[in-house]
């Protein structure tokens, strides 16, 4: 079984991790992408794209950010893009039903972007 985690890098985490749960429930990291403080992570329905919010801003911006990833053959995340959240403190995200839009809830600014 594959699953994905966002980890606080300022506390020693590696960023976004792709993991596999194997025999005897042993967890194995299959890939990682360093982004500063990624938190909430979701995949699309086909599980070929992954999205996360980061408490840290994209370069040269204020507030948080969102990132998108493709998932390689083994499920490892590969960074596609990172954008400003247009809000502060992004904490949750969801895809529109047709998966054309990504919505972010911003805790600090109290906004949706």
PLM regions with names:
Residues 28-34, 78-84:
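A short beta-strand motif characteristic of beta-propeller blades
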Residues 43-47, 97-99:
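Residue-level detector of Asp-centered blade-edge/turn motifs that repeat once per structural unit
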Residues 9-12, 56-60, 108-111:
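Short glycine/acidic-enriched loop and turn motifs that connect beta-strands
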Residues 36-38, 88:
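Loop/turn position at the start of each blade in beta-propeller repeats
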Residues 19-25, 69-76:
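Short loop/turn segments immediately following beta-strands, especially the blade-tip
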Residues 15-17, 64-67, 111-113:
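A short loop-to-beta-strand structural motif that recurs across blades of beta-propeller domains
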């Amino acid at each position: 079984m594959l699953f994905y985690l966002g980890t606080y890098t300022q506390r020693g985490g590696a960023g976004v991790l792709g993991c596999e749960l194997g025999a005897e429930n042993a967890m194995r990291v299959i890939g990682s992408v360093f982004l500063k403080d990624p938190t909430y992570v979701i995949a699309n329905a086909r599980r070929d794209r992954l999205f996360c919010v980061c408490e840290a801003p994209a370069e040269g911006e204020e507030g948080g950010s969102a990132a998108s990833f493709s998932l390689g053959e083994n499920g490892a995340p590969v960074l596609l893009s990172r954008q400003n959240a247009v809000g502060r403190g992004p904490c949750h995200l969801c895809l529109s039903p047709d998966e054309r839009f990504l919505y972010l809830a911003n805790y600090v600014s109290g906004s949706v972007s």
